[in-house]
UniProtKB/Swiss-Prot annotation:
NCBIfam families in alphabetical order: PRK00099.1-1 (NF000955)
Name under which the protein is recorded: Large ribosomal subunit protein uL10
Annotated Gene Ontology cellular component terms: large ribosomal subunit
Species the sequence originates in: Rhodococcus opacus (strain B4)
Originating gene: rplJ
Family: Belongs to the universal ribosomal protein uL10 family.
Length: 186
């Protein structure tokens, strides 16, 4: 690769690092072009999967301010640059690696910190943002319904007490009249 090509490749990779919310570093040894194409489709529109030379990636990472990944840039390396939510892309990579043993997840980078393989897998095991928001909304709706029931309970209790008191007075009034009538008859 000629020097101007290397400079432009480093600049492109640097921009990918800067524009990504997360990156997952993988080893692709043994994958076919068809496998990689399938993986790119599985990652969706929020991620790109790029193969690059390790020396160029190291230089680009340093220029982007990404630290702690140099040990991962050994052997045939490809990087999934993720824009947006990292959960879905990490899940796609984990599932693809499960089905294709040739893909090895080496680690990643997110929120200014290097990630181990276990941390990438933990991210992949999380539920998507939409599902978590739906669960939160459901929990809030249930709690609001309970609160409404609690606020309505005192009013209904007062109404029941008033009705019971009225019935009691009516019964006492009727009971008081009955002995008076019995005394008048005698």
């Amino acid at each position: 690769m000629a020097k101007p090509e290397k400079v432009s490749a480093v600049a492109e990779i640097t921009e990918q690092f800067k524009g990504s919310t997360a990156a997952v570093i993988t080893e692709y040894r043994g994958l076919t072009v068809g496998n990689i194409t399938t993986l790119r489709r599985a990652l969706g529109e929020g991620a790109t999967y790029s193969v690059a030379k390790n020396t160029l990636v190291k230089r680009a990472a340093a220029e982007a301010g990404v630290e702690g990944l140099d040990d991962l840039f050994v052997g045939p390396t490809a990087i999934a640059f993720i824009k947006g939510e990292p959960v879905d892309a990490a899940k796609a990579l984990k599932n693809f690696a499960k089905d294709n043993k040739a893909l090895i997840i080496k680690g990643g980078y997110m929120d200014g910190a290097a990630l181990s393989v276990d941390e990438v897998n933990k991210i992949a095991d999380l539920e998507s943002r939409e599902i978590l928001l739906a669960k939160l909304a459901g929990a809030m709706k249930g709690n609001l319904a309970k609160a409404a029931g609690l606020f309505n309970a005192p009013a209904s209790q007062v109404a029941r007490l008033a009705a019971a008191l009225q019935e009691k007075k009516a019964a006492e009034g009727g009971a008081a009249e009955a002995p008076a009538e019995a005394a008048a008859e005698s």
